[in-house]
């Protein structure tokens, strides 16, 4: 019951706290192309995460589940939207259902709505190999997300305080998983060092989960008597984290998430090196405040606007979008310079 109540609290506070932190994409400028040699009607948006082929570089990221009928209804609606637009979708952490079988329905609903969809199971880094297998089977998942949420746990009144052995547990899951494993942050970004460690144990796909989206430190602080306010602005901005990711030179697929709200955000994230982008809080807010049809319409507009931007840049495919010239400036440039990461190759390609 405590876990289910926490799930509902997360939805309430995520909607009320909003997305107040910057994601850094304002520091990224495309180099205008006066002769793009492109046609809007022939632009294609297919992409891949590792060996998973996706029809769109937009997917619905992990949000909820395990909070009774309310979270079941949210996942049901999100699965409908995913089916309508042929988008991949992740569920929220399934540990609630592994602890309490009665909560499994709030996750299994997605397969009932969209039997042929691409879905990602989701567990925290405390999960065992056996729990990972059960989570994948629960939703007949095409991939498994393992989320890293140290700051959220530290801020959570009842959260974990011991993070030893995480990399070793992830390695065991990767070695034993029958589906691809995606390791993701939850709004605090990832450093190049973290990504190199993950690559060293066989992880091939990473969701950088940058600062700029739902602020889970702020969400958990709303649930505390004594706030740990110093965590509210903690983390690496999304744009910065994508560039840190690409600087590792590992054979990794990258998902950009963390405050992604517009087609321009999507285009910039992909041009920086992401293979795809993920939306969570922005989609949830539209769904809860304006309804499912409004969310369906918003995704239509996102795809149309992305194609407009790709046409302007002369990028006929997502792969070509990953190589258009752009300039990194401002605080993002300063951070990366201090970190020893050269960004000039972006502007000269």
From Swiss-Prot:
Keywords for the protein's UniProt record, in alphabetical order: Cytoplasm, Flavoprotein, FMN, Isomerase, Isoprene biosynthesis, Magnesium, Metal-binding, NADP
Gene Ontology biological process: isoprenoid biosynthetic process
Gene3D superfamilies recorded: Aldolase class I
Subcellular locations according to the entry: Cytoplasm
Residue ranges that the Swiss-Prot or TrEMBL entry lists as coiled coil: none
SUPFAM superfamilies tied to this protein: FMN-linked oxidoreductases
Residues annotated as binding substrate: 6-7, 152
Catalytic activity: isopentenyl diphosphate = dimethylallyl diphosphate
Necessary cofactors: FMN; NADPH; Mg(2+)
Binding positions (Mg(2+)): 153
Pfam families: FMN_dh
HAMAP family the UniProt entry points to: Idi_2
Subunit comment: Homooctamer. Dimer of tetramers.
PANTHER family reported for this sequence: ISOPENTENYL-DIPHOSPHATE DELTA-ISOMERASE
Protein family according to the UniProt entry: Belongs to the IPP isomerase type 2 family.
Functional description taken from the UniProt entry: Involved in the biosynthesis of isoprenoids. Catalyzes the 1,3-allylic rearrangement of the homoallylic substrate isopentenyl (IPP) to its allylic isomer, dimethylallyl diphosphate (DMAPP).
Protein name: Isopentenyl-diphosphate delta-isomerase
Lineage of producing organism: Bacteria, Bacillati, Bacillota, Bacilli, Bacillales
């Amino acid at each position: 019951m405590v876990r289910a109540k926490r799930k509902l609290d997360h939805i309430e506070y995520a909607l009320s706290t909003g997305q107040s932190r910057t994601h850094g994409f304002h520091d990224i400028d495309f180099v205008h192309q006066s002769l793009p040699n492109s046609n809007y009607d022939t632009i294609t948006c297919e992409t891949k995460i590792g060996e998973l082929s996706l029809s769109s570089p937009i997917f619905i990221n992990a949000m909820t589940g395990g909070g009774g009928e309310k979270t079941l209804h949210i996942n049901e609606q999100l699965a409908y939207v995913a089916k309508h637009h042929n988008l991949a979708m992740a569920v929220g952490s399934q540990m609630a259902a592994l602890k309490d079988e009665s909560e499994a329905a709030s996750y299994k609903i997605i397969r009932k709505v969209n039997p042929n969809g691409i879905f990602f199971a989701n567990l925290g880094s405390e999960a065992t190999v056996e729990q990972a297998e059960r989570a994948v089977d629960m939703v007949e998942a095409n991939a498994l997300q393992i989320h890293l949420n140290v700051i959220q746990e530290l801020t959570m009144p009842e959260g974990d305080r011991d993070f030893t052995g995480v990399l070793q547990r992830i390695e065991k899951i990767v070695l034993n998983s029958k589906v691809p494993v995606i390791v993701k942050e939850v709004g605090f970004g990832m450093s190049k060092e973290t990504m190199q460690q993950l690559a060293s144990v066989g992880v091939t796909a990473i969701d950088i989960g940058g600062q700029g989206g739902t602020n889970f430190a702020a969400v958990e602080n709303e649930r505390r008597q004594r706030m740990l306010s110093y965590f509210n602005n903690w983390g690496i901005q999304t744009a910065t984290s994508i560039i840190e990711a690409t600087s590792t030179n590992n054979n990794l697929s990258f998902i950009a998430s963390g405050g992604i709200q517009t087609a321009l955000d999507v285009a910039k994230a992909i041009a920086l090196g992401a293979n795809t982008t993920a939306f969570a809080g922005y989609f949830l807010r539209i769904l809860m405040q304006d309804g499912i049809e409004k969310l369906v319409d918003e995704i239509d507009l996102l795809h149309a606007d992305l194609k407009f931007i790709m046409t302007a840049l002369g990028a006929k495919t997502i792969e070509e979008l990953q190589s258009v010239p752009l300039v990194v400036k401002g605080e993002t440039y300063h951070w990366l310079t201090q970190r020893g990461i050269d960004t000039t190759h972006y502007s000269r390609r």
